[in-house]
């Protein structure tokens, strides 16, 4: 009988919750600001975890670089807090990566909205010209 979810998936889901809470409540570095954990991928042996993050209200590349440096510097501290919060034999090594998918999704949505708006305006102008 196979399981519905692999253990690494369950650990990733729990890690996402714990790290989000830790970043919100425990990490006080001002360079990090409003950070969201969008996804977590855990290796099969649970030794490594890739944490995908986005920074809210911050599209400045320099601020994002500074935030990522701060997260990398705080990774051992975050890992120790995760170890206390979760009962794991091996607490995964945390590797933070910036998740561009949210920013790209918003950019694409804005492009579509602008195209639809200009198309409607063009049709309205054409209808007014026919009258």
From Swiss-Prot:
Pfam families per the UniProt record, alphabetical: RBFA
InterPro entries per UniProt: KH_dom-like_a/b, RbfA, RbfA_dom_sf, Ribosome-bd_factorA_CS
GO molecular function: ribosomal small subunit binding
GO term, biological process aspect, one: maturation of SSU-rRNA
Entry's localization field: Cytoplasm
UniProt xrefs under SUPFAM superfamilies: Ribosome-binding factor A, RbfA (SSF89919)
Cytoplasm as UniProt keyword: yes
Assigned keywords, A-Z: Cytoplasm, Ribosome biogenesis
GO cellular component entries: cytosol
Subunit structure: Monomer. Binds 30S ribosomal subunits, but not 50S ribosomal subunits or 70S ribosomes.
Family of the protein in this entry: Belongs to the RbfA family.
PANTHER family: RIBOSOME-BINDING FACTOR A, CHLOROPLASTIC-RELATED (PTHR33515:SF1)
NCBIfam families: rbfA (TIGR00082)
Function of the protein: One of several proteins that assist in the late maturation steps of the functional core of the 30S ribosomal subunit. Associates with free 30S ribosomal subunits (but not with 30S subunits that are part of 70S ribosomes or polysomes). Required for efficient processing of 16S rRNA. May interact with the 5'-terminal helix region of 16S rRNA.
Protein name: Ribosome-binding factor A
């Amino acid at each position: 009988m196979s399981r519905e979810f692999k253990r690494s998936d369950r650990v990733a889901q729990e890690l996402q919750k714990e790290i989000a809470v830790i970043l919100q409540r425990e990490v006080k570095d001002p360079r990090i600001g409003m950070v969201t954990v969008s996804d977590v991928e855990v290796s099969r042996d649970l030794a490594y975890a890739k944490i995908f993050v986005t920074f809210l209200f911050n599209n400045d590349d320099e601020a994002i670089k500074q935030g990522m440096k701060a997260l990398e510097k705080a990774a051992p501290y975050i890992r120790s807090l995760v170890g206390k919060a979760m009962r794991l034999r091996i607490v995964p090594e945390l590797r933070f990566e910036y998740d561009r998918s949210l920013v790209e999704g918003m950019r694409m949505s804005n492009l579509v909205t602008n195209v639809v708006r200009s198309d409607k305006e063009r049709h309205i102008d054409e209808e007014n010209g026919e009258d």
